[in-house]
Regions:
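Extended, subdomain-level signal for the structured scaffold at the beginning of enzyme domains
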Residues: 1-100, 113-160
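ADP-ribose/adenylate-binding Rossmann-like module
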Residues: 101-108
């Protein structure tokens, strides 16, 4: 499939307290290297504290930042944060809308509880190549895949 690239595009990163700081840094670097931007979405407008104690300012609050605003999304959560997202309609909708719009979705393993609450498999990458585990694959690989802009196979798989 053609790969127009991710330059000029926007990655929405849904971030919770305790999310892995190294994964966030790698995503930011890989996105910048492709000429794209990152927008941080947090459960509250004040931002979050990531795993190394750094306070990360939110560009958007979850309730006002649906995944439709982004070309691709990533979910960086720790278990407690993922459970909190799963309990919120906006958290579940963020995921289900991204799936419905055939977006590439990067995630860390703690997001499994959010996927389950949204009615998805807890390991969605086993059935859908549009999901990329950032716990298993480098951020640069995820961003390169995002250059395809959409994972259209998902739409074809659900149409039949």
């Amino acid at each position: 499939m053609d790969n127009p690239g991710f330059a000029g595009r926007k990655l929405g990163v849904l971030l919770t307290n305790g999310a892995d700081a190294e994964t966030l840094a790698a995503l930011r670097a890989a996105t910048a290297a492709e000429g794209a931007t990152v927008e941080i979405i947090a459960p509250a407008v004040g931002g979050v504290d990531v795993s190394d104690g750094t306070r990360v300012r939110a560009d958007q609050q979850l309730d006002g930042a649906p995944s439709v605003l982004y070309d691709a999304v990533a979910i960086l959560a720790e278990p407690g944060g993922a459970r909190a997202l799963a309990a919120r309609p906006a958290g579940r909708d963020f995921v289900t809308d991204a799936v419905a719009h055939c977006k590439f979705i990067g995630y860390t393993s703690a997001a499994a509880v959010l996927f389950e609450a949204a009615g998805l498999p807890t390991d969605p990458s086993s059935a859908d190549d549009g999901f990329i585990s950032l716990s298993e694959h480098p951020a640069a690989e995820f961003i390169a895949r995002c250059g395809q802009l959409r994972y259209w196979h998902r739409e074809f798989a659900t149409a039949g």
